[in-house]
Amino acid sequence: MSIEQLAETAQAMVASGKGIIAIDESAGTIAKRFSSVGIENIEENRRAYRELLLTTPKLSDYISGAILFDETIRQSTKAGVPFPKYMAEHGIIPGIKVDKGAYPLAGCPGELVTEGLDGLRARLEEYYKLGARFAKWRAVINIGDDIPSGMCIDANVHALARYAALCQEQGLVPMVEPEVIMDGNHDISAAYEVTEATLRSLFNALYEQNVVLEGTILKASMVIPGTDCEEQASIDEVAESTVMCLKSTVPAILPGIVFLSGGQTDAQSTAHLNAMNQFDPLPWPLSFSYGRAMQQAALKLWSQDMKGNFAKAQQVVYERAKENGLAALGKWKG
C-alpha cells in the first residue's frame, strides 16, 4: 500500500466527530467482563456480543473503526457475513490487536515489556487478507518508586516502532499505544512527566525506524493522577495538562490522536475529551478509542436478557458513541 493510501486510511480513522471502538479484549479479559455480569464465557456468547456491538444500527455516524481480537476477525454475523466484510460494507474500518501482551521486563522489577514481534510480518500479511486496515500495539508504563526506568521506556518504544514499521510495510496503519497506567498514588505532575518522557522517546524511535507519521495514529493516555492519589484533578486540569503534554511532544503532521479510557468512568472519559476539544486551535484532531467506557453499560443490560435486550443494548452503544462523538467536537453538553 502506498503512503497516500496509508494516510487516507489514517485520516478516515480520525474523521470529524468520529472515534474508534475497542473490542479487542483478550480471552482472559473478556472472561472477567462476562463473569462480572454472569455471562458464560463460551465462543458463541463472545461472537454474539461482538455482533451486538458491530451491527448496532447507524454506528458509523460516530464510529470510524473498530479494533478486533484475533478470534473476532475470524468470526461472522449470525447470517454468515464475516465481521470485517460487514464492517467495511457499513462504513467501519476493521482493525486488529497484534501484540501478545505485557510481561515482566528482566532486570527491572515492577516494569513490563510488550511481546509479539516474532512472526509479526506473517501475521500482519494474514490480517490484511482477512480485511484489517489498521493494527494496534499496546505498551504498558507503570509509575511507582523509581519507575519507569529509561530502560523500560526504551524497550517499549523500540518495540512499538518496529511494529509500526512492519505494519506500514504490509499496508496497515499502525496505532501506537504507550499506556501510562492510572494505578498508584502518583499526582498529576508525575503523570505529566512520565507521559512526556514516553511520548518524546516514542517519536524519536518512530523517526529512527523510518515510520511515516502521516500514516500513523497515536492512542494516548490522558495526563491524570493515580487512582489512589489523595489530590484528584478537575476536568479542566486534566484537559489542560494533557493538551500541553501532547503539544510539547507530538509532531503536528500526525493525522490524529485517540485516547484510551484507562479505567475512567464513562462520564469522566467523555467530559475530559470534551474539555480538551475546547482548546483552539489544536494541531491534530483529538478523539476516542474507548473499550470499557463504550461497552460496560450495554454489556450489563444485555446480560439481563440476551435475546430480549439485544436491540436495547445496541441503543445504549449508539448513545455512548454519540456522546463521545460530540465530545470529539467539543459539543457534548453532559
From Swiss-Prot:
Arranged from A to Z, the UniProt key words for this protein are:
Glycolysis, Lyase
- What does the record give under GO molecular function? fructose-bisphosphate aldolase activity
* Domain of life from the UniProt record: Bacteria
| E.C. numbers | 4.1.2.13
Gene3D superfamilies for the chain: Aldolase class I
Q: Which reaction does it catalyse?
A: beta-D-fructose 1,6-bisphosphate = D-glyceraldehyde 3-phosphate + dihydroxyacetone phosphate
SUPFAM superfamilies named in the record: Aldolase (SSF51569)
A biological process from GO: glycolytic process
The name this protein goes by in its record: Probable fructose-bisphosphate aldolase class 1
